[in-house]
Amino acid sequence: MNRRAPRKTAMLMAGVLVFLFLLQFILPAYHHSTFSKIMVLASYAVGFNILLGYTGLMSLGHAMFFSTGMYVTGICVYHFGFTGIPALGIGLVITVFVSMLIGAVALRTSGVSFLIVTLMFGQTAFLSVLYFDQFTLGQDGFTLTKELQPLVLGSTSFSYTDPNFKYNAAWLLFAVCLILSNLLILSPIGRVLIAIRENEERTQMLGYNTYLYKLFALTLSGTLSGLAGSVHALLFSYVGATFAEIHHSIAPLLWTLL
């Protein structure tokens, strides 16, 4: 492996993050929300790429993870009066559990079968959103504008509707996802995931339990996707069934391939 490659990747990543951070001081305030949404969805794509780009597994059910984080966080705020950070934490924990559970079942298959199983789970999640409309409010969804309280850090409070706060929160999410993804690929676990992508049978012959490594990759991928969904709910104060539809699983696939 080229020793300079990790350094070049780290420098490129740092350059992108610095550019995006400084961009907020150049852009007019009314563009901050647009770029905030781009960075949140880019974080979703980074999470998806751990499964597809690193491990070679194509999923059509990632909208399930994104919407799980979104709905759990949104329901905690809307129905139970939680503030933003605790609601996000609960959404993250539930997404980890769902990712592990779905992965434990879906990874018993491979290839096209895995694609179909993830699609099946994704559609089940979408139909569940419509069925349990007493909590999700069905197809229309719900807004968090009135229920969501400002984030209080010490003596300072931050409104989730403030464009500057949105931008910096989205930038922080993207930075965490990007750095974590880069650290993973440079780690021994990341090398095994790449080996599985290239030749799973040969990796098994070397003594690695590929099922557990793939389960780890799917769990981490789903968790980052759910985290992006939770942050999206808080920053844009809307939770809706459209984020659980299949097109929201296809979108990160296209972003990753492009």
PLM segments and residue spans:
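Transmembrane alpha-helices and adjacent helix-loop boundaries
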Residues: 1-258
